[in-house]
Design a protein with these regions (language model features):
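Charged, amphipathic alpha-helical segments and their flanking helix caps
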Residues: 1-23, 45-160
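Short acidic low-complexity segments
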Residues: 25-36
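A short, glycine/Asx- and small/polar-enriched loop/turn
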Residues: 34-40, 145-148
């Protein structure tokens, strides 16, 4: 996968393993909201790719936003969306490092045997993607009938 797809997979996997949140609507995947049922819409927004240092072949720093829109049924008041927002803010807390290993990375082998590290973990040809959370915040809720929506913005960065 490309670095952007690894970042997306890292954040999406972290979101999917969050306990207590409603169904997740992903980018470019068919999703039909059901009136009366809450959901979270997730969008990855890459914002920049810049050299981390000067010189030949510098490491690149990627920055972006992970935009989450919590949609709860209209008429429940703002608290329903804020309850989910609190779970997401805790899950994507500032200074959190999220580690993602692409399941399609090849295992490094020698003579048909996996090369193991001292702790008996396998050595991958690639390295895991580490996405760091810069900040997470809640924005003002708004009505989008039949849903009341609460935006959560998560700023992230990674080096590659």
């Amino acid at each position: 996968m490309t670095i952007i797809n690894d970042i997306r997979a890292c954040l999406d996997t972290h979101l999917s393993s969050t306990v207590g949140i409603p169904a997740i609507a992903r980018q470019n995947v068919p999703f039909e909201p059901t009136t009366g049922t809450s959901f979270v819409k997730a969008d990855l927004i890459p914002t920049s790719r810049r050299p981390a240092v000067r010189g030949l072949n510098p490491q690149q720093r990627y920055d972006g936003l992970y935009s989450l829109l919590i949609c709860t049924p209209e008429g429940l008041g703002p608290g329903a969306g804020y309850d989910v927002a609190d779970l997401l803010l805790d899950r994507f807390n500032a200074t959190t490092d999220i580690i993602y290993t692409n399941p399609y990375d090849a295992i490094l082998q020698e003579d048909g045997f996996d090369i193991l590290l001292e702790d008996n973990s396998r050595l991958l040809l690639g390295s895991p993607t580490i996405v760091s959370i810069d900040y997470s915040e809640v924005r003002t809720s708004f009505l989008d009938s039949p849903f009341y929506c609460t935006p959560v913005t998560i700023a992230w960065y990674t080096y590659s």
